[in-house]
Amino acid sequence: AYGEAANVFGAPK
């Protein structure tokens, strides 16, 4: 879930 959300926030991970 986090990995997917990180893609939205543009986070490194």
Curated annotation (Swiss-Prot):
Family membership: Belongs to the PsbP family.
Protein function: May be involved in the regulation of photosystem II.
Keywords: Chloroplast, Membrane, Photosynthesis, Photosystem II, Plastid, Thylakoid
Gene Ontology biological process terms from the UniProt entry: photosynthesis
Domain of life: Eukaryota
Keyword Ion transport: no
This protein's name: Oxygen-evolving enhancer protein 2
Miscellaneous comment in the UniProt entry for this protein: On the 2D-gel the determined pI of this protein (spot N179) is: 5.9, its MW is: 22 kDa.
Organism: Pinus pinaster (Maritime pine)
Annotated localization: Plastid, Chloroplast thylakoid membrane
